[in-house]
Amino acid sequence: MKNIMRNKEVKLFAVIFAVFIASMMLFATTAHAATVTTKNMPSKSVCVGSSKTLAKPNVSGFKWKAINNTYYTLTTAGKLTGKKVGTASFSVTCKNVKYVYKVTVKNRPKLNCTSKTIRVTEKLNLKVLNAGNSTVIWTYKNPKVVYDGVGYGPGTTTATARCAGVTMTCKVTVKDYNGSLAKKMAPKANANVLSAFDKLGFKIKYDPTVNYGGCFNAHERTITLRFVGDNTIYHEMGHFLAFVAGNVDRSSDFAAIYNSEKSKFTGINRSYATQNATEYFAESYHDYILQPTETKKKLPKTCSAISDAVKKVTPTRVARVKEIYGPFWK
């Protein structure tokens, strides 16, 4: 009888234990499913035919999975490659978190042209098509030929645009300006001064690599400027005027004017402009052209000297300058 009771107890215990184990397994399964959460990750974009490597979230054990859908492919190394324009999401589950990524595939950016010819001081006007809201970064191989999208000097160079992971290039040829560059870039200067500049064979050059704003060189017959469109050209034209009028900035008469009125000069380049009579004459010409009324009021003697210098630039004077300096000019 005791054996029968013991067998029943054993069987009952076995049934209870089995039910307990089953319930624990069910609870464990239910609890695991309930703790999975979804986390939307920052959207990604890629262009058709382009690739980028996605950065993993800072989660231990996270691994990319291989995906090949209509719009893009993803490798286990995280390399995302665009196939067709469109949008699709994928997810990766790691440690009870479902990471969801929305991927948009866009048209590949391209330049509006792959070769272009412009002249010095002209804008390149290249455009990136299909750029959308993506940032475009421009670089130019030779800044002495093209700088900041503007022709700076004759020659050939390459313009490069980088946008949305795509690199595009355009061959650019820059030719000399067809006409008087002095008249184009310093249109407010005195007509006879500009005419003398051209007749004596002087040239304007641009070089963004120099460490100064402008430089007049009578021996080389050049005005070198750092930036296209800078009003510094009027300062350098002041140097040219002084030279062609007979180096009037170095005369004793102008030295007396310089000493009497330099303290009245209030331009933004005051320290540089008043260091000597030569720079004072050039910068005063700059103001004489661009701010005539104010400058004549503040510096009457200086402006009178500049006006006299302008009057000296006659065809006869130009011919004389050419006769004297011609043998030294190449």
Predicted features and spans:
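Active-site-flanking segments in enzyme catalytic domains
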Residues: P187, A191-K330
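Extracytoplasmic soluble-region selector
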Residues: K2-N3, H32-Y177
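Intrinsic disorder/low-complexity segments
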Residues: V10, A14, F20, C47-V48, ...
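Active-site acidic/histidine clusters and adjacent loop/turn architecture
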Residues: A182
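Gram-positive cell-envelope targeting signals
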Residues: M1-T35
